[in-house]
């Protein structure tokens, strides 16, 4: 869970490949393709602040935490993928960065 309207930041430089609410259950969502072949996903957004084709930089605000899709509290669903395979994002963070983890 996260406070409604909190800024959502791009995890790394990349190009927005999807920014919409057309996938059932996910609400408003952004997908970013990165040069290393990874894709990051940010779902349940209240607002989308980037468009398909936009070049985004690490730390750039791309959206706001929301309560869209199949959720009952404001939250951000973050995913890191390589192709169709979901990866554990904690294994790909830059050493020394802090991370707040929430689980169900």
Predicted regions and their residues:
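Catalytic cores of peptidoglycan-degrading enzymes
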Residues: 1-104
